[in-house]
């Protein structure tokens, strides 16, 4: 029998003995190896027996022998491939743990060599990168030789694969796994240009990861408490799987913390003017402002260095705080489909002073049939209100019930705003920041456009804000899945109400009215009369000039409809109380003053005073929409001798009736009787839901309302 035949016989005999007598099988193989030490099959069979019996130490020794003596055998590499896969695997099953333990028994030098050779066997870029990553983590000394090369390979693979989003498997491995190993190793020498390139890639990845919207999360699983979702760092614990990676590998804890750590390390390597210890965002921003004051005094190299410090430090403070603001005022952008529904908040001009400046006792009602001299005091006109609100510092009011952490959120808004202003303050900073934003395609970030729109409104640049809102509408159109759901109509509401508030601030009252009336189509009825809501929302006395206050309003029908009515009233009262007579505008004002009655009592008295001065008044929609008992009694009083016998044309076609007939005693008596009956019918309607009445007024009289402001 030949030597090969002998080996095969011995291996076969050992296999037959394994089920019944393991020790006998091992004895046969030990004998066989002593006779034929160069035969691979004998050693491999010995290894197989030890591996199947899960004897870690002996299996490890045999694997080591095979790796040294038979490095070209495919079976050895198949085995090594299984072991390295177990090292990369997140699983905790018994077999995987055994294979990891087996690898640990190998000498460090062999582990390193094995991983290097295993890497050479990989033709898949991702698998090869993960294998090299194993090597770099276990043997930090290899980072100098292989770290930068691996990083560049991953970035090159990202370009070759033409990844749509920076949040992809290649970028994740580079930013989260490879980059920290490179920049934290003092033996790896990197030019500043490469460090800035890597910082840029890391910032783009982390910001996109944290701000990924629900539309892009096709593999999003589960949801979280709304309180947790307020925190961008906590939000990262949602189950989100990056294509090509495992669930565990896709999770990133404290992404902002990681990003600012990279910023700090890069800053030290680039010899920035760094502060020792941890600094708040406010401190960082203050430091950058100081640096900007004397940045122009440096030579070109130092200027470039500190320019990069200011741009990257300020930019990261900006994006962090802008996201913090938007994720709190509109959390639905970043939550999963099963998350609790929280109404978004919208930044609007505060028009709660629409009723005038005179303090009103809200519990007081109009004295029935008061005498003209006593009851009709002149109220202060608000014609002189300055709606532009271009004060440098403006107060933003918000109810605690709508936003529990309002102090922190408004501080984030302030920091983001100041960061943006700093980045735009010098041409060199602005140019670099713009370049980065273009490369990141930030113009497609819906959440960022929401922040920028609010910031522009805050700055009082209303024409620019209108352009920004049109940009926002285009972005929302590109996020088509949301348009199918309620989110689409919600975004439309946000755009319409902010457009309305901007047009109002510009004095463009017809456009204001148009947007408000379009918005009324989205209002869900019924809404309870909100007369007492304002009592729960005391007006904050601000040190800023009149008309400069802003407020964060919930985007709900209950909150938005009262705001719309305020805007309409503000538009029409300017026309109603000018020297030129406009009964239609005055009639619209009277209808709108029913809302939150008696807050508008003084303005109503001003309207009555104007009617008395005119001696007559025509408004044929009166009985369609005026149901307030105090107003009805006042108008009934106007027709009496004591009230001044004011000529009122409040019935439809009443004017035509008088014009086309000879005014006889009988016809006049008939008109009086019609008026009395109409008043009686109207009194019976006083219990109607006023918000339903006013909503009907806005919908049915849209053409008339717009014509009045033309």
From Swiss-Prot:
GO cellular component: INTAC complex; integrator complex
Principal location: nucleus
GO terms under biological process: RNA polymerase II transcription initiation surveillance; snRNA processing
Compartments reported by the entry: Nucleus
Alphabetical keyword list: Nucleus
UniProt-annotated stretches for the region Disordered: 366-393
Biased composition (Basic and acidic residues): 372-381
Family (UniProt): Belongs to the Integrator subunit 10 family.
Subunit structure as annotated in this protein's UniProt entry: Component of the Integrator complex, composed of core subunits INTS1, INTS2, INTS3, INTS4, INTS5, INTS6, INTS7, INTS8, INTS9/RC74, INTS10, INTS11/CPSF3L, INTS12, INTS13, INTS14 and INTS15. The core complex associates with protein phosphatase 2A subunits PPP2CA and PPP2R1A, to form the Integrator-PP2A (INTAC) complex. INTS10 is part of the tail subcomplex, composed of INTS10, INTS13, INTS14 and INTS15.
Function noted in UniProt: Component of the integrator complex, a multiprotein complex that terminates RNA polymerase II (Pol II) transcription in the promoter-proximal region of genes.
Name of the protein described by the UniProt record: Integrator complex subunit 10
The organism of origin for this protein: Gallus gallus (Chicken)
Species lineage: Eukaryota, Metazoa, Chordata, Craniata, Vertebrata
Gene designation per UniProt: INTS10
């Amino acid at each position: 029998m030949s030597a090969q035949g002998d080996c095969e016989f011995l291996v076969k005999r050992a296999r037959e003995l394994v089920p019944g007598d393991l020790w006998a099988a091992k004895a046969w193989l030990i004998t066989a190896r002593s006779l034929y030490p160069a035969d691979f099959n004998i050693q491999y069979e010995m290894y197989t027996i030890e591996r199947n019996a899960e004897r870690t130490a002996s299996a490890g020794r045999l694997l080591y022998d095979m790796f040294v003596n038979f490095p070209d055998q495919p079976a050895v590499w198949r085995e090594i491939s299984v072991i390295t896969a177990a090292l990369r695997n997140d699983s905790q099953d018994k077999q995987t743990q055994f294979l990891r333990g087996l690898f640990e028994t190998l000498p460090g030098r062999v582990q390193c060599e094995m991983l290097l050779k295993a890497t050479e066997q990989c033709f898949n870029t991702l698998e090869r990168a993960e294998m090299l990553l194993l090597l770099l983590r276990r043997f930090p000394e290899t980072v100098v030789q292989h770290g930068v090369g691996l990083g560049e390979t991953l970035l090159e693979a990202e370009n070759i694969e033409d990844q749509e989003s920076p949040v992809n498997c290649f970028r994740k491995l580079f930013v989260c796994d490879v980059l920290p190993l490179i920049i934290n190793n003092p033996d790896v020498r990197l030019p500043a240009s490469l460090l800035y390139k890597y910082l840029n890639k890391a910032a783009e990845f982390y910001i996109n990861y944290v701000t990924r919207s629900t539309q892009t999360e096709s593999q999003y699983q589960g949801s979280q408490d709304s309180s947790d979702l307020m925190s961008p760092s906590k939000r990262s614990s949602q189950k989100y799987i990056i294509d090509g990676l495992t669930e565990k590998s896709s999770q990133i804890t404290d992404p902002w913390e990681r990003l600012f750590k990279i910023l700090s390390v890069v800053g030290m390597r680039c010899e920035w003017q760094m502060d020792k210890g941890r600094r708040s965002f406010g401190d960082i921003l203050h430091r950058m402002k100081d640096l900007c004051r004397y940045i122009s005094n440096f030579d070109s190299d130092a200027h470039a260095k500190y320019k990069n410090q200011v741009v990257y430090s300020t930019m990261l403070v900006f994006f962090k705080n802008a996201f913090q603001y938007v994720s709190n005022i509109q959390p639905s952008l970043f939550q999963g489909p099963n998350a609790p529904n929280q109404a978004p908040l919208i930044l609007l001009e505060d028009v709660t002073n629409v009723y005038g400046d005179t303090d009103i006792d809200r519990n007081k009602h109009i004295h029935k049939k008061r005498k003209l001299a006593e009851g009709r005091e002149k109220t202060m006109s608000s014609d002189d209100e300055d709606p532009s609100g271009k004060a440098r510092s403006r107060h933003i009011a918000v109810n605690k019930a709508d936003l529990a952490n309002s102090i922190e959120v408004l501080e984030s808004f302030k920091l983001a705003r100041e960061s943006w202003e700093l980045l735009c303050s010098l041409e060199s900073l602005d140019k670099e920041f713009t370049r980065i934003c273009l490369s990141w395609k930030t113009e497609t970030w819906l959440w960022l456009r929401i922040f920028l729109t609010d910031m522009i409104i805050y700055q009082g640049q209303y024409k620019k804000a209108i352009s920004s809102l049109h940009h926002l509408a285009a972005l929302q159109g590109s996020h088509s899945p949301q348009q199918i759901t309620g989110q689409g109509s919600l975004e439309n509401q946000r755009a319409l109400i902010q457009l309305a508030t901007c047009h109002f601030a510009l004095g463009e009252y017809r456009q204001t009215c148009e947007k408000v009336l379009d918005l009324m189509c989205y209002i869900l009825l019924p809404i309870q009369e909100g007369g007492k809501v304002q009592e729960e929302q005391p007006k904050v006395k601000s040190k800023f000039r009149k008309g400069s206050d802003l407020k964060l309003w919930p985007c709900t029908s209950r909150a938005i409809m009262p705001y719309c009515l305020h805007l309409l009233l503000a538009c029409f009262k300017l026309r109603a109380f000018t020297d030129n007579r406009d009964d239609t505008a005055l009639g619209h004002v009277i209808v709108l003053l029913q809302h939150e009655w008696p807050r508008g009592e003084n303005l109503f008295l001003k309207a009555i005073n104007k009617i008395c001065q005119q001696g007559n008044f025509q408004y044929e929609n009166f009985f369609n929409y005026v149901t307030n008992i105090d107003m009805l009694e006042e108008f009934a009083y106007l027709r009496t001798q004591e009230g001044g016998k004011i000529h009122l044309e409040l019935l439809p076609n009443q004017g035509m009736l008088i014009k086309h007939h000879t005014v006889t005693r009988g016809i006049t008596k008939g008109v009086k009787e019609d008026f009395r009956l109409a008043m009686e019918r109207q009194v019976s309607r006083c219990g109607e839901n006023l918000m339903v009445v006013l909503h009907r007024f806005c919908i049915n009289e849209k053409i008339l309302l717009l014509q009045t402001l033309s």
